[in-house]
A protein has these predicted regions:
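Blade/loop signatures of beta-propeller domains
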Residues: 25-72, 227-236, 383-388, 460-462, ...
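Electrostatic cytochrome c docking/interface patches
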Residues: 31-32, 592-617, 689-695
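Repeat-blade elements of multi-bladed beta-propeller folds
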Residues: 44-48, 83-103, 128-154, 179-203, ...
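Extracytoplasmic beta-rich repeat domains
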Residues: 76-87, 117-140, 168-183, 221-259, ...
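C-terminal capping alpha-helices of c-type cytochrome domains
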Residues: 149, 667-695
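His/Cys-centered metal/cofactor-coordination and adjacent catalytic loops
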Residues: 588-610, 623-641
């Protein structure tokens, strides 16, 4: 790991850069301190800073008048080229954050020195069973411990001073394709954690563990299991009535992979659930039923996990419209009275405002244009008014938004002074959904049920549609309308921070970190980080001076499927950057990737039919990690594979020769002849790229 720290004569930095290393041990982070986190302006103790998840800081040294003087103080490389999505936590001048492969770091906020690092040694072959890169969205702090969920399903408690493991709990059945990429949530002496894996075929649930001992307190499932074995609760018994067929043999889905929040006053936990398995309702059963509680927002009692209420955003989901996007609590004046609400900008393109006590639908509206799956929401119930063209049984359709959504996991922020919610929005994303009528559950592969070999006319139509766009959106949740939109030249924007300085901070895929005026969206400052940014910034005090830190590192599903943004998105070496007023450090960005077009490393005689077949197989088996059309982001671009790699191609793909690097064996998925067809396709793509452009 490399560090770059600036020497500065600016007085505010001198104040920040003395004396911290010998500070007293931090004040205990207990339940009372978490409940009063809003008044603790110096620190960032939780994922969204406070239990309401506003990501609003009362700090204002950095404001619309002074932000032009904001500069880099230090950067710390983290030794990865994979995605970085974590929200850093800050307590008493120490940054606690997570990186690729669930690695945890404790970093001195003034010097960038790594106080300790903990690597949970996740088996690299596990990468195949992870939907969207080997990412982690952050840790939790409580009573002298740091908690992290790992990609292989463990929940680990570390000593905050040393990084030494205190306890570890297996939260999943490791024989099944579960994973954890989300952050833990602390509530009432418990650590709450969910999991991912619905694309492969698992049953979703959320678990509560005793923060001191690591023993499980309760577990609440989100979709019903095998009825012949009985139901764990009345909620599961009722949910089973909305399913048909033998859904439990595939797991059912509905995983809680993100977005757990807690209201201490109501003693309720809120979380969203993911898609059902398979994606398409006609493959899950007869195409009927709401399939509870997949693609829904749930509230459960914190003491026992019992269901309090639910609201389903995509009944009978057919489009991968998870409801796992960030949830945010607020008390808003609506209709002449104060309402306790919970809000979500959903994947499906609608912004929801619900009563968080009862789950009552208050309001909802589209926050992006071009939605085709639904014409609107029922004004009383909030149930979507599904478009006739959004479901055609087993026939292919084009629908907007795409499975990446109009908004995904990237955190949004709420500023109480403006009354606005700020979020990264994607406009005009489209997807071709082609259900595979021959699909059968296979525990060794993706089980979304999509026909990756579809070659019909809709494929050409999809390619002819206008490309999507990205924007930072300021949304009024009371009026359910946009206050302003700040367009940017890429589709993907990172998470958001807002402050009392009338500022909104956000990074984006092209590596730009920008500050906007919160009231009107005017861009006031920007910094080129050299690498795409997905994570949200945080802000805090070090000896009275305000700092801003952000994780920088491109990856996730868009690292592979960002075809509309090729040439704009910047993969690179992951790092954490820290800024302050008067910072003068410079950023050295090592070269990453290839600057010259690829050339085929070997000659392989293959017919056009074989190459075409290889392209279909590549799309089904390889594009998930190595990129659509054999054009990769942070992972190896196979068009540049060397002669040595091609000579070992079969050994790597079928023999698992690089399993320790995250490339598992595909021997149960493809034959030798199919591997050769994939190889021929990759070489063909390298040859196409090497050709001079036609005049």
């Amino acid at each position: 790991m490399r560090t770059h720290v600036a020497a500065s004569s600016v007085s505010v930095l001198l104040l920040a850069l003395v004396g911290l290393s010998s500070c007293d041990r931090p004040r205990a982070i207990d339940d009372a301190r978490l409940r009063s986190a809003d008044g603790d302006t110096a620190n960032w103790l939780m994922y969204g800073r406070t239990y309401d998840d506003h990501r609003f800081s009362p700090l204002s040294q950095i404001n619309e008048q002074t932000v032009a003087k904001l500069g880099l103080v230090w950067s710390r490389e983290l030794g990865t080229t994979r995605g970085l999505e974590a929200t850093p936590l800050v307590e008493n001048g120490v940054i606690y954050t997570t990186g690729s492969w669930s690695v945890v770091y404790a970093i001195d906020a003034q010097t960038a020195d790594v106080r300790w690092m903990y690597d949970p040694a996740v088996p690299r072959a596990r990468a195949y069973f992870i939907c969207c890169d080997v990412v982690n969205r952050g840790a939790a702090l409580y009573r002298g411990k740091v908690y992290v969920g790992t990609l292989d399903g463990r929940l680990i408690a570390l000593d905050a001073q040393s990084g030494t493991p205190v306890w570890s709990a297996a939260t999943v059945d490791t024989t099944k394709p579960y994973a954890i990429t989300g952050y833990p949530r602390i509530a009432k002496g418990m650590v709450l954690i969910g999991n991912a894996g619905a694309e492969f075929g698992v049953r979703g649930y959320i678990s509560a563990y005793d923060a001191e001992s690591g023993k499980m307190v309760w577990r609440a499932y989100t979709v019903p299991g095998d009825p012949s074995l009985g139901f764990e609760s009345k909620a599961m018994e009722q949910a089973a009535k909305t399913w048909n067929g033998e859904w439990w043999t595939v797991g059912g889905g509905g995983t809680v992979w993100e977005g757990i929040v807690y209201d201490p006053a109501l003693d309720l936990l809120y979380f969203g659930t993911g898609n059902a398995t398979a994606w398409y309702r006609t493959l899950r059963g007869n195409g009927e039923g709401d399939n509870l509680y997949a693609a829904a927002i749930l509230a459960v009692h914190a003491s026992n996990g019992e269901l309090a209420w639910y609201f389903q955003t995509a009944p009978g989901d057919n489009w991968d419209y998870d409801a796992t996007q960030p949830l945010m609590q607020a008390d808003l004046a609506i209709g002449g009275r104060q309402r306790k609400v919970i809000m979500q900008a959903s994947k499906n393109g609608f912004f929801y405002v619900l009563d968080r006590e009862t789950g009552e639908f208050i309001s909802g509206a589209p926050f992006v244009s071009g939605i085709t799956w639904a014409s609107g929401l029922d004004p009383k119930t909030g149930r979507p008014i599904e478009s006739p063209t959004a479901f055609a049984g087993l026939q292919p359709i084009i629908v907007s938004p795409d499975p990446g959504g109009a908004h995904n996991w990237n955190p949004m922020a709420f500023n109480p002074a403006t009354g606005l919610v700020y979020l990264p929005a994607k406009v005009g994303t489209q997807a071709l959904h082609a259900p595979d009528s021959q699909w059968k559950y296979d525990p060794n592969r993706h089980n979304i049920g999509s026909d990756a070999r579809y070659e019909g006319p809709l494929k050409a139509k999809l390619r002819s549609l206008p490309p999507p766009t990205g924007e930072l959106l300021a949304w009024d949740p009371v009026k359910q309308s946009a206050a302003w939109r700040a367009k940017y030249p890429v589709v993907e924007g990172g998470g958001v921070l807002t402050t009392a300085g009338n500022l909104v901070f956000q990074g984006r895929a092209d590596g730009i970190l920008a500050a906007y005026r919160a009231t009107d969206g005017q861009r006031l400052w920007e910094f080129n980080a050299g690498t795409g940014i997905m994570a949200p910034p945080v802000t805090y005090l070090v000896n009275g001076a305000q700092f801003v830190s952000v994780m920088v590192g491109w990856g996730g599903p868009d690292g592979a499927y960002n075809a509309p943004e090729r040439g704009k998105v910047k993969p690179g070496y992951g790092r954490i950057l820290t800024f302050a007023l008067g910072g003068t450090a410079t950023l050295s960005v090592p070269a990453f990737g290839h600057t010259e077009p690829p050339t085929p490393a070997i000659v392989m005689n293959a017919s056009p039919e074989t190459i075409h077949e290889g392209g279909l197989l590549y799309g089904a088996q390889c594009a998930h990690c190595h990129g659509a059309d054999a054009v990769a982001g942070p992972l190896p671009d196979l068009r540049y594979a060397t002669k040595a790699v091609h000579e070992q191609f079969e050994t790597i793909v079928l023999g698992g020769a690089r399993a320790s690097l995250g490339m598992p064996s595909f021997k149960d998925l493809v034959s030798v002849d199919q591997v050769r067809a994939i190889q021929a396709y990759i070489l063909s793509r390298a040859g196409e790229a090497a050709k001079p452009p036609s005049k």
